[in-house]
Amino acid sequence: MGFWNDATQQAILDTTIAIGGAGGAGYMIGLELARIGVQRFDIADPEVFEDVNSNRVFGVRDQTIGLNKAEVFRDDILAINPEAEVRVYTDGITRDNVAEFMSRADLVLDATELNMPDLGTMVCREARRRGIPVLNVEYVGHGAQVTVFDPTRRFTFERMMGLDENAPLDAIATQTISSSRFLSYIPKYGDLRTLMAIREGAPLPSNMIGAGTAAQLGVAEAVKLIRRRVGEKHASPTFAPRVRWLDPYAGVAGRTRLPRVSYYRHLAVAVVRNKSKSHETAGYTKDARARRGDVD
């Protein structure tokens, strides 16, 4: 209560958060919101925890390997607040359940995979229809970025990702989203061979620094959005096309309303540092991952 008033605290208690995807950032955001007082959650994730998730997801423990992520997430929230209401969707978000998933939500956290653009599009379209803001966080390197899609504004998820706002979901499912669309920040210390590996289909690498930073940015934006519901507008959320990023490892932070320009500006710096060999080398090429047994 030393940081907000009674109205804000009550709004936090009354808020329902819908979380699509119980990965690193989504999981931490949910747990931290539970600790500040959010009591109602709807969580969707069809996947089970694997060993590889242990580098960034609080829910991964020896005894949770092989268990559904959403169900473990629910149990961890209830361990913080036994009176919390948590609904889980172990089939993930589907066309059949997306309306029910958002039926009581005040805020949606879209932590779905961008390699399935139809899923993120479906979530954001349903949220727009219901007038619900969508929080989007991404982590890259040891940093992260955040933006919010406001249902009352013209800059939509599809527009930001370079997708047709009127295209059917089946058509969007065949699209590939360029990294210049969903990343506004590239760390100058990054090894560009990692970026090339991602473009060739390797999973986006992650660690606890980046995931933790994404969680802090996400929680901060969530609190701003909750406070706006009771008329507290001192801190404005980062509404798209604006994107805010933070990299505690590099000691840099920034905000832009031109995300693609920001991407290419950061990329240019990274290219120069890679050519001059002043970057930090990584082991994420296909050959390096094959030697570790990460790929077939």
Provide a role label for each language-model segment:
Residues L107-D150:
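ADP-ribose/adenylate-binding Rossmann-like module
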Residues I43-N81:
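Glycine-rich phosphate-binding loop and adjoining beta1-alpha1-beta2 segment
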Residues M1-I17, G24, L204:
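A short, basic/flexible loop-to-alpha-helix module at the beginning of a structural domain
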Residues A70-L107, A111-G120:
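A structured beta-alpha segment of the ubiquitous adenosine-cofactor-binding alpha/beta core
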Residues M1-G2, K224-D296:
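Phosphate-binding loop/pocket of nucleotide- and phosphate-handling active sites
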Residues P151, T213-E232:
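Oxidoreductase and adenylate-handling cofactor-binding alpha/beta cores
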Residues L13-E50:
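Glycine-rich adenosine-cofactor-binding loop
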Residues T156-T213:
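A conserved mid-domain beta-alpha-beta active-site/ligand-binding segment of alpha/beta enzyme cores
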